[in-house]
Every structure is written in structure tokens, then in C-alpha cells.
């Protein structure tokens, strides 16, 4: 046992929730962002502007999402070069096979399959890396065979499970928009602020439609909410870094005083059902957009692209293109910016008044 521990340490193979559930998951979301999400935005712009070249570029970028996610995961796991490059093949296979179900239908588990399988393949590759004199053959061979083999065995099952969870969430939101609006908004909003990836969660379970809209609401409540709530401490720099960056910057302060999170959580519990019940706000762009909030305005761009040209996942879930009017635009602006700012500011005033939030509690270093 001691020899195994020594070997794993030498190979930098650390089986931990942080490395797999935070580092790898977050990197996967970045890979998805740099391929599928950017590709969708570029393709939509090309279609709207009549520029075939942009449509072609967007298609190429989207097609590489599996490879991009797997390579990003390998980078997070500190995989050596030969393993990292081999993961491109693993990601392609896992994403393709995870996008099917056990009965051969269309599945939503591509990103989730890539996450699980790329982690295992990367660690297998790291284990054999530089252990033989024919490393240039053995390392990619082990990485690719392990990854593609697991993809063939497990990816369709993962696709089936992810599809089932996503379908239940979407159907429940359609049937109970008030309750699920609160639940989805609060959970995804908290996931965005925690050091895990809300974007990857939304992508893994293909959250589109009303559930996607509730997720956007929750993320915006945290990002815009914390930006406004902490304005007196952090001024304009904090407003920008949190408002269109990430509310995760407040995680250290939340650990020191968890009560500073209450305004954002309460705000998300209000804006979520307003999004689902009043404005019927649907996010039918790439599912990853639902977990991005106002980060680079990706959530809002996702809603817009979903209006004009719904993503493949949204179409599979019954989404359809619409021509947005003043009501839709008003809903998007209110849910994304106005309500989170106003509500979180008001809740913050109350909590400061009763002494739950003190001067400096929200200051960013």
C-alpha cells in the first residue's frame, strides 16, 4: 500500500473532491465556453449578418467541443504533454457517444461523459507516462484506449441518465414554475458563487427552456447582487469584476461571514419565479449559457441566440425560435440587471441595519 501511495504521489495522481469536482469541472466549463459557446455566438452572428464565413467558423468551433473539454480537464489535472494531446481523441469520442442514449436516441450527457471519462483516461495516461522506453507509443495508446473504451461502455448510459435528470427538471419547471423557479434559481446561483462550475452543471444536464431561464436569473442575482451590495467597499472596480466577472471573488468573505450571502440568495428566490411565472423567460441557447449569468453577458447572449436560433439541445427539448418583442426584452433586462441590483441593495441595507453585515465584510483584497 505504501508503494502505491508513493507511486501516485510521484505521478501527481491525487484522488480528491477538489481536484475532480472543482478544478476539473471548472476547466471543463472553460473548454466548453471556448468551443461550443463561442461557436454558437459566431454562427448566430453570421446567420443574422449574412456572413457565411462566420457560420462556417462557428460550426468548426462547436464541433470541437468534446476535444476542447477533455484537453481542458487534462490541463487542470496537470497531465503531461503526450497525455494532454491524446485527450483530444478521448473527448471527441466521449462527447459523441454521451450525446446518445442506450436506446440510440438523442442524449444530453456529452459534457458529463467527457468529465468522467477524461478524468479516468488522464489519470491512466499519467500513470504510464515516462515509465517505458517507448513512451511515445505507450502513453497515447493507453490514454486513448482507456478513454475510447470507457466511452463505448459508459457514455451512452451517462447520456441516458443526464437526459433523464434534465427532462425531469425541465418538465417540473414547466408544471410547477413557481416552486421550481425558486429551486433552480437558488441552487444554480449558489453553484456559480461556490468554487464549482454552474455552467458545467447546466451543460451536463442540458438545462434549457424555463429551467434555463431560472438558472440565468439565479446567476444574475449573485453576480449583479454582490456587485451592487459591495459597492461601498469595492467601488467601480468591484462592480465590474463581480458584475461581469464572477461573484466567486466573494467566497473568502462568505466563509468568514456566511450571512453576507443572504441578500443574493433571497434575491434569486424572488427573481427565479418572476422569470418563470411572469415573463416566461426561456434560455434556449447553448445550455452552458444558463450557468454563466452576466459573466461577459454570456447568459444574456444565450437567451438572445435562443430566441433567434435555438440550440440543438433546446430544439430536442421542444424549444422554438421566436421574434422577441418589448415584453421579452423588458423581462431579460429586469431579470438580469434591474431586479438583482434593486433587491440585493435593499436586502443589504436591512442586514447592515441589524448588524449582520458590517463595514468591510464585503471588501475584496
Functional labels for PLM-detected ranges:
Residues 2-365:
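Pore-lining transmembrane helices
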Amino acid at each position: 500500500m505504501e508503494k502505491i501511495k508513493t507511486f501516485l504521489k510521484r505521478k501527481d495522481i491525487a484522488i480528491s473532491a477538489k481536484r475532480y469536482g472543482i478544478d476539473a469541472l471548472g476547466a471543463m466549463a472553460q473548454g466548453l465556453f471556448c468551443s461550443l459557446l463561442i461557436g454558437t455566438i459566431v454562427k448566430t452572428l453570421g446567420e443574422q449578418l449574412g456572413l457565411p464565413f462566420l457560420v462556417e467558423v462557428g460550426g468548426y468551433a462547436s464541433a470541437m467541443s468534446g476535444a476542447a473539454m477533455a484537453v481542458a480537464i487534462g490541463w487542470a489535472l496537470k497531465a503531461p504533454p503526450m497525455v494532454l494531446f491524446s485527450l483530444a481523441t478521448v473527448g471527441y469520442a466521449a462527447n459523441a457517444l454521451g450525446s446518445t442514449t442506450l436506446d440510440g436516441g438523442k442524449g444530453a450527457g456529452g459534457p458529463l461523459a467527457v468529465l468522467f471519462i477524461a478524468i479516468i483516461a488522464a489519470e491512466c495516461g499519467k500513470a504510464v507516462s515516462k515509465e517505458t522506453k517507448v513512451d511515445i507509443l505507450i502513453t497515447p495508446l493507453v490514454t486513448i484506449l482507456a478513454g475510447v473504451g470507457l466511452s463505448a461502455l459508459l457514455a451512452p448510459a451517462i447520456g441516458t441518465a443526464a437526459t433523464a435528470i434534465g427532462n425531469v427538471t425541465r418538465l417540473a419547471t414547466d408544471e410547477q414554475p413557481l416552486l421550481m423557479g425558486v429551486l433552480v434559481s437558488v441552487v444554480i446561483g449558489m453553484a456559480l458563487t461556490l468554487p464549482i462550475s454552474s455552467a458545467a452543471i447546466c451543460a451536463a444536464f442540458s438545462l434549457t427552456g424555463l429551467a434555463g431561464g431560472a438558472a440565468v436569473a439565479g446567476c444574475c442575482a449573485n453576480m449583479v447582487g454582490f456587485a451592487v451590495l459591495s459597492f461601498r467597499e469595492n467601488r467601480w472596480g468591484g462592480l465590474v469584476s463581480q458584475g461581469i466577472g464572477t461573484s466567486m471573488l466573494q467566497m473568502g468573505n462568505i466563509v468568514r461571514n456566511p450571512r453576507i450571502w443572504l441578500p443574493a440568495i433571497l434575491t434569486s428566490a424572488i427573481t427565479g419565479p418572476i422569470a418563470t411565472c411572469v415573463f416566461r423567460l426561456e434560455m434556449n441557447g447553448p445550455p452552458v449559457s444558463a450557468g454563466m449569468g452576466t459573466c461577459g453577458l454570456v447568459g444574456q447572449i444565450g437567451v438572445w441566440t435562443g430566441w433567434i436560433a435555438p440550440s440543438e439541445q433546446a430544439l430536442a427539448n421542444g424549444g422554438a425560435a421566436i421574434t422577441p418583442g418589448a415584453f421579452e426584452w423588458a423581462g431579460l433586462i429586469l431579470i438580469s440587471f434591474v431586479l438583482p441590483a434593486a433587491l440585493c441593495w435593499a436586502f443589504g441595507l436591512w442586514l447592515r441595519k441589524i448588524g449582520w453585515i458590517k463595514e468591510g465584510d464585503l471588501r475584496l483584497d
